[in-house]
């Protein structure tokens, strides 16, 4: 019915309906194929119902699905990047808020242009990443068992939440602390005039570095589920963890000020021991179930 209505509309408005007819046929075939093999619609994936796939997919069908999901992922990514380019001035103003009162200079003719494109690209990737992860899950989950799906879904959701919390922590705590240190350190000697491009490289590296550091509990849970490292072992090596957190904090922090490194190292320690505690809880629940 929807297919016939599409053709009727195209005839009414005298469009080139032959091309649309071909596209509609292909689209209808894809929907039929998807519902035949996955038992549900695109928006509510079959995999969330935890049922077994009744029909095995051939290699050609797998490749077709990969192509479709890659196409939609790339389309959403491109759309988000273009949208961020359109509203890049608003994004730039938001990233400039932690450095209120600082004057930015452009040392090259195209510095602002290329820096704004870079900011828009990172922002577009960040915004489109949930959809891309969703498409990957729709492709991977049907081939997994019920227990594997129950394990993977909370980990993926938790990872995305922690990544967002890392960005928030970096923007509201780490970035202001680091900038205040640099501003006050030489305020009585020099007047701060910062390079526009170097400032945004500093901000982006610090934000994404903090977001990656927040993935530590997810990594610990994966190691615990795979029984590579137990929760007790994670707690037993706490001395090495303190040393390693200091090194990681120094590496992920683009600045050399001790305050930012201490803050990041402290949050890494909190995340590590929180992840180790979660691993112990999971191990205890698995023993009770057995």
Swiss-Prot record:
Stored Pfam families = TatC (PF00902)
GO MF: proton motive force dependent protein transmembrane transporter activity
Membrane topology, record value: Multi-pass membrane protein
Top-level taxon: Eukaryota
GO cellular component labels: chloroplast membrane; TAT protein transport complex
InterPro entries of this UniProt entry? Sec-indep_translocase_CS, TatC
The alphabetized UniProt keywords are:
Chloroplast, Membrane, Plastid, Transmembrane, Transmembrane helix
Q: Which PANTHER family match?
A: SEC-INDEPENDENT PROTEIN TRANSLOCASE PROTEIN TATC (PTHR30371), SEC-INDEPENDENT PROTEIN TRANSLOCASE PROTEIN TATC, CHLOROPLASTIC-RELATED (PTHR30371:SF0)
What is the name attached to this protein's record? Uncharacterized tatC-like protein ycf43
């Amino acid at each position: 019915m929807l297919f016939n209505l599409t053709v009727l509309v195209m005839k009414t408005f005298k469009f080139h309906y032959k091309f649309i007819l071909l596209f509609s046929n292909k689209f209808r075939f894809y929907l039929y194929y998807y519902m035949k093999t996955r038992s549900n619609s695109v928006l509510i994936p079959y995999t969330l119902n935890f049922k077994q796939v009744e029909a095995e997919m051939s290699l050609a069908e797998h490749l077709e699905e990969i192509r479709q999901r890659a196409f939609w992922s790339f389309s959403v990514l491109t759309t988000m990047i273009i949208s961020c380019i359109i509203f890049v001035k608003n994004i730039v103003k938001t990233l400039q808020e932690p450095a209120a009162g600082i004057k930015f200079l452009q040392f090259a003719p195209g510095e602002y242009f290329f820096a704004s494109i870079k900011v828009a690209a990172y922002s577009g990737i960040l915004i489109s990443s949930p959809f891309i992860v969703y498409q990957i899950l729709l492709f991977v989950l049907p081939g997994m068992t019920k227990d594997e799906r129950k394990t993977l879904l909370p980990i993926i959701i938790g990872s995305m939440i922690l990544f967002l919390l890392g960005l928030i922590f970096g923007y509201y705590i780490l970035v202001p602390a680091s900038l205040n240190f640099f501003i006050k350190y030489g305020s009585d000697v020099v007047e701060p005039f910062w390079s526009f491009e170097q400032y945004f490289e500093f901000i982006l590296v610090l934000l994404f570095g903090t977001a990656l550091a927040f993935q530590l509990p997810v990594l610990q849970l994966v190691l615990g589920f795979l029984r590579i490292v137990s929760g007790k072992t994670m707690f037993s090596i706490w001395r090495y963890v303190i040393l390693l957190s200091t090194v990681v904090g120094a590496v992920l922090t683009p600045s050399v000020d001790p305050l930012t490194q201490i803050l990041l190292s402290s949050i890494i320690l909190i995340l590590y021991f929180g992840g180790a505690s979660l691993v112990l809880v999971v191990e205890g629940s698995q023993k009770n179930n057995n």
